[in-house]
Amino acid sequence: MQTKVNELLKPRHIEVTSVSDRQAKVVLEPLERGFGHTLGNALRRILLSSIPGAAVVEAEIEGVLHEYTSIEGVQEDVVDILLNLKGIALRMHNRDEATLTLKKKGPGVVTAGDITLDHDVEIVNPEHVIAHLTKNGELSMSLKLGRGRGYQPVTARRSSESEDRPIGRLMLDASFSPIRRVAYKVESARVEQRTDMDRLVIELETNGTVEADDAIRQAAGILQSQLAAFVELQGDESTVTESKQMEIDPILLRPVDDLELTVRSANCLKAENIYYIGDLIQRTEVELLKTPNLGKKSLTEIKDVLASHGLSMGMRLENWPPPGLKDQDKKASG
């Protein structure tokens, strides 16, 4: 087999073996020496952290105000019930949130199959046990579902959500990942006379909401999209310039007239060729006070108006002004 010196051998054989409905083994070969660990470790980390999934994120149980309590007629306490809710394997199609209900009277076992399903929501492990009810036991709850990636503890979501949460609505640490276990190993492979090649073997187990081979494809796609940014480093400078221009806050491109300043303040700014908010915020207080007819009262007015938009004096902007902005000034003044 003749290959160019700088040409890397690409894998030509991919084998997917289903061990069970939730377990699979994927073999990829041949790989250049060292690429087995490079790709195996990257895919493993992505599979565990970045494959999207659905999970129960909140529960509201009738008669329960907090998780450190028990329910009459239910063998498990509330903490155990919440732990069992985390084990429900869900699929949500074409939606990011859903609310389901569960109502059951004892005696008997409460399972995920007792949950009343909404459209586009599927439970793949209906036999999963949630609680056990005695003869007079009764369990009624409302469950909020959400989509996400990886693991999100309650503390992380509380910081981004409103604190005005009704008493009795219990938040759960959410494990959105449909991947339960991933392991990889690198074996020796041979291609004609070369015996130093790698064979990558990935073994993974899912919760049943995603096929193992599909999860591998998703992980590879994520890795490819992330590495694309490094490939684009070889592009021309215009690509980099355009991306930097997109980072400019749109409010900075608005004329100072949009700030609704007094006529005196607005005229003083225009006399100094300050037409846009992006021009204004780059001036310091000392510079503005040197403007004819602009006193401390006008300066205070300008500072207060900028503060109401989250801006301040003396800010520095890269790539300002953006191309074409001054051309618009000329057209407007002409």
From Swiss-Prot:
Subunit structure: Homodimer. The RNAP catalytic core consists of 2 alpha, 1 beta, 1 beta' and 1 omega subunit. When a sigma factor is associated with the core the holoenzyme is formed, which can initiate transcription.
Keywords tagged on the record: DNA-directed RNA polymerase, Nucleotidyltransferase, Transcription, Transferase
Superkingdom as given in the UniProt entry: Bacteria
Recorded catalytic activity of this chain's protein: RNA(n) + a ribonucleoside 5'-triphosphate = RNA(n+1) + diphosphate
GO biological process, one term: DNA-templated transcription
Region feature Alpha C-terminal domain (alpha-CTD), mapped onto this chain: 248-334
Name of the gene encoding the protein in the UniProt record: rpoA
A GO-annotated cellular component: DNA-directed RNA polymerase complex
Pfam families with a match to the protein in the record: RNA_pol_A_bac, RNA_pol_A_CTD, RNA_pol_L
Protein EC: 2.7.7.6
Keyword match Transcription: yes
Domain free text: The N-terminal domain is essential for RNAP assembly and basal transcription, whereas the C-terminal domain is involved in interaction with transcriptional regulators and with upstream promoter elements.
Family of the protein in this entry: Belongs to the RNA polymerase alpha chain family.
Protein name (Swiss-Prot/TrEMBL): DNA-directed RNA polymerase subunit alpha
GO terms assigned for molecular function: DNA binding; DNA-directed RNA polymerase activity; protein dimerization activity
Chain residue ranges for the region called Alpha N-terminal domain (alpha-NTD): 1-234
Listed Gene3D superfamilies: 5' to 3' exonuclease, C-terminal subdomain, DNA-directed RNA polymerase, insert domain, RNA polymerase, RBP11-like subunit
Function, in words: DNA-dependent RNA polymerase catalyzes the transcription of DNA into RNA using the four ribonucleoside triphosphates as substrates.
